[in-house]
Amino acid sequence: MSKSENLYSAARELLPGGVNSPVRAFTGVGGTPLFIEKADGAYLYDVDGKAYIDYVGSWGPMVLGHNHPAIRNAVIEAAERGLSFGAPTEMEVKMAQLVTELVPTMDMVRMVNSGTEATMSAIRLARGFTGRDKIIKFEGCYHGHADCLLVKAGSGALTLGQPNSPGVPADFAKHTLTCTYNDLASVRAAFEQYPQEIACIIVEPVAGNMNCVPPQPEFLPGLRALCDEFGALLIIDEVMTGFRVALAGAQDYYGVVPDLTCLGKIIGGGMPVGAFGGRRDVMDALAPTGPVYQAGTLSGNPIAMAAGFACLNEVAQPGVHETLDELTTRLAEGLLEAAEEAGTPLVVNHVGGMFGIFFTDAESVTCYQDVMACDVERFKRFFHMMLDEGVYLAPSAFEAGFMSVAHSMEDINNTIDAARRVFAKL
């Protein structure tokens, strides 16, 4: 047995499914998950000594690549001053200043420890601010594992095939209205059915938890208009897209102004950080200035703030997003060319530093129904054959891939060559 197999066997006796987050167990593709020893730049190294070109990037945070020296040094320096204080620090203020400068729609920001905390807290704030209970989310979109959001969710919940997770009371779920991504008519119908009861819409501006599905041109502006018409707040969940699709996020890329924004992943530079923020009048409703309660023992942790501050300063440098787009576009075009040569039906969606691979005869993939019609079994075979070639893709047909600026054009071309060999045998 390999070291990964031995570790997985031991882990399953101690951790549910052998992992601390379900998708890591390779549930969506089968087989034994890789146990990682270290990572550097664009590469992962498993405990058996094999190297992989990495397109998971810790599920999004590693936009600069693994083990970036600026982030590593910031963490070391911060750790020498102490690990946690439970009191305000200068770095929290500097981090808040930087985030609100980079994302102009955020007048104020509250730091938390995860994307789930960010979305959960933003929804509570929207409900408290509006005095309404119902929310709108979209099929196949994942916003963390809070009870009200595990309704027709994406990500690992989609892999498990559960429309709702057991343990979510029906009394909670009834306040979550699920509409179809990229379908404004379904959203209007929900508002017209409950015109005075909907507190907010929460949306991934690029749906990255049913693989990678960008919005149609009219979709996000249409959501903004409907929220204005019916007095609801628009929450844009940029946990995945923030600082990746564009420096100011997908909201800037697509030209839409939310009331609240949720951030995560890149904002922590690899440390556990989330954040939510937006309009000053809405944020003023948050404790301690307002009645909507939210708190966290480790929120604003000095190590995490130092890592995030270093990461965002690097991400804000000129050329970063142009490089991400160039590399991702080359990968997408190369995969399509290789698939066409082999006669393999394929769609590759991409925006900024995100991409999605779909085995389908359809000309495009634009919604949940399109995603669910794709050939998941073929993706499973593709995943394992690419893994054998030394390419680590997301181990699920429903998860986006992530590029970093540490990837070289040689890495991209090697990935395309590997895919060409795989398509020929697939």
Swiss-Prot record:
Keywords: Cytoplasm, Isomerase, Porphyrin biosynthesis, Pyridoxal phosphate
PANTHER family: GLUTAMATE-1-SEMIALDEHYDE 2,1-AMINOMUTASE, GLUTAMATE-1-SEMIALDEHYDE 2,1-AMINOMUTASE 1, CHLOROPLASTIC-RELATED
MF annotations from Gene Ontology: glutamate-1-semialdehyde 2,1-aminomutase activity; pyridoxal phosphate binding; transaminase activity
Protein name as it appears in the record: Glutamate-1-semialdehyde 2,1-aminomutase
Family label: Belongs to the class-III pyridoxal-phosphate-dependent aminotransferase family. HemL subfamily.
PROSITE patterns named among the record's database cross-references: AA_TRANSFER_CLASS_3
Binding partners and assembly: Homodimer.
E.C. designation(s): 5.4.3.8
SUPFAM superfamilies: PLP-dependent transferases
Catalytic activity: (S)-4-amino-5-oxopentanoate = 5-aminolevulinate
Domain of life: Bacteria
Cofactor: pyridoxal 5'-phosphate
UniProt pathway: Porphyrin-containing compound metabolism; protoporphyrin-IX biosynthesis; 5-aminolevulinate from L-glutamyl-tRNA(Glu): step 2/2
Residues bearing PTM N6-(pyridoxal phosphate)lysine: 265
Lineage start: Bacteria, Pseudomonadati, Pseudomonadota, Gammaproteobacteria, Enterobacterales
The keyword Isomerase is annotated on this UniProt entry: yes
Group of enzyme by EC: isomerase
